[in-house]
């Protein structure tokens, strides 16, 4: 008998077995491609905190476009992405008349070099659009330089004005996506359809767990489904992560179904993995003062927290903490909710709670924003703000 293969794919950007809760977005985009140039949903800006499935949605848009005969170029927004788009078009259609200047192969692109590159890029984009259509997807927009974004945006706007068969979708953290559309030279992107990815409902998540496992050859006990749904906290990445490890636990025992016990063990393994992959690397990029801001937020009551209350917890004035707050917003760790009110958004579903309990130690806890996942860990803290993150161990708390 053929061994059932684990259907869950908890790898960043990899397509899951089922795309949950995005049907309307995909239907609107497919119809826009069918309706031709000028359809509003051909321009799309996708925002969301980490773990909400932005890259996966871009992949799905690309799959739809390919099925309709479009050429699709997917790029990340780090330095040199305009040149990478051009290189991809050259590879795909063998545009021998276009040559890439060695001066723009590096990371640093001067304004003169960029103008030359953009001229060739526009020609390549127009040629691809004439043949069968062109979709460009741009991911991690927070990494994009303003200059390159303007160059690509200007070329795209010109093609749209010419009635070319093009589409453009870009994704990133909420503040970075908002920052792009308010740029004076990219105002046309304000008309792009805004898709804000939020947490999935428990109903959607629970149904997906059951359907995915059943199609792959395992049943899911009712109690196990409830545990996995709660642990995922509505985040697509966590759905894949806890589903993957719960399946593995059941598979190793030779079970034909995923029991509550397998779900609990799988959730614990997923939390360990989540800590190593997501939490610890994120905290390494947070300065001591920024972490104190996060810790102060975690000690405040409620979910949406006033900046004044955070500053008070830190023993500082509200104006004094402004720079820490801005960096945390830019990093996607906290989210503005209203005037001077903020919400913790620690990567996918975790926030940091901190409280001292000994002179030389601090107790750390990580919990979901909605309280769905609660784990704790403790670690000695050495001088110099070294939190010993490489040695963190996570345990489930009921």
Task: Describe these PLM feature segments.
Residues 41-59:
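Walker A/P-loop nucleotide-binding motif
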Residues 115-175, 182-185:
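Conserved Walker B catalytic segment
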Residues 349-366:
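Short, amphipathic alpha-helical interaction segments positioned at domain boundaries
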Residues 63-81:
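Conserved catalytic segments around the Walker B and adjacent sensor/switch elements
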Residues 1-42, 91:
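A short, basic N-terminal segment
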Residues 315-330:
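Short amphipathic alpha-helical interaction segments
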Residues 234, 240-316:
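Winged-helix-like regulatory helical subdomains adjacent to P-loop NTPase cores
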Residues 197-224:
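Conserved small helical "lid"/interfacial subdomain of P-loop NTPases
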């Amino acid at each position: 008998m053929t061994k059932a293969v684990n259907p869950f794919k908890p790898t960043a950007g990899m397509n899951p077995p089922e795309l949950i809760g995005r049907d309307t977005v995909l239907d609107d985009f497919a119809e826009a491609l069918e309706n031709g140039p000028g359809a509003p949903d051909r321009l799309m800006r996708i925002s969301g905190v980490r773990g909400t499935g932005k890259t996966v949605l871009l992949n799905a848009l690309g799959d739809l476009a390919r099925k309709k005969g479009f050429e699709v170029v997917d790029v990340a927004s780090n330095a040199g992405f305009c040149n990478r788009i051009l290189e991809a078009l050259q590879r795909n259609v063998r545009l021998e008349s276009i040559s890439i200047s060695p001066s723009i192969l590096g990371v640093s692109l001067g304004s003169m070099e960029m103008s030359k590159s953009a001229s060739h890029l526009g020609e390549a984009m127009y040629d691809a659009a004439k043949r069968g259509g062109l979709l460009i997807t741009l991911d991690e927009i927070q990494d994009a330089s303003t200059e390159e974004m303007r160059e690509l945006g200007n070329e795209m706007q010109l093609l749209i004005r010419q009635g070319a068969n093009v589409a453009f979708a870009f994704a990133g953290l909420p503040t970075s996506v908002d920052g792009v559309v308010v740029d004076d030279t990219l105002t046309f992107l304000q008309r792009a359809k805004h898709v804000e990815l939020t947490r999935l409902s428990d109903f959607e998540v629970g149904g997906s767990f059951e359907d995915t496992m059943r199609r792959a050859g395992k049943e899911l006990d009712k109690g196990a489904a409830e545990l996995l749904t709660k642990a995922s906290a509505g985040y697509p990445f966590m759905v894949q992560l806890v589903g993957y490890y719960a399946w593995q636990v059941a598979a190793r025992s030779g079970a034909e179904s995923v029991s509550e016990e397998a779900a609990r063990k799988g959730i614990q393994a997923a939390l360990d993995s989540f800590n190593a992959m997501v939490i610890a690397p994120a905290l390494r990029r947070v300065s001591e003062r920024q972490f104190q801001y996060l810790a102060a937020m975690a000690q405040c009551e409620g979910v949406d927290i006033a900046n004044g209350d955070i500053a008070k917890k830190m023993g500082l004035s509200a104006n004094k903490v402004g720079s820490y707050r801005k960096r945390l917003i830019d990093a996607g760790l906290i989210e503005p909710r209203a005037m001077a009110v903020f919400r913790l958004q620690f990567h996918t579903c975790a926030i940091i709670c901190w409280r001292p309990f000994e002179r030389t130690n601090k107790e750390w806890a990580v919990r979901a924003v909605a309280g769905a996942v609660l784990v704790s860990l403790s670690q000695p803290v050495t001088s110099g703000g070294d939190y010993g993150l490489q040695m963190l161990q996570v345990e489930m708390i009921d």
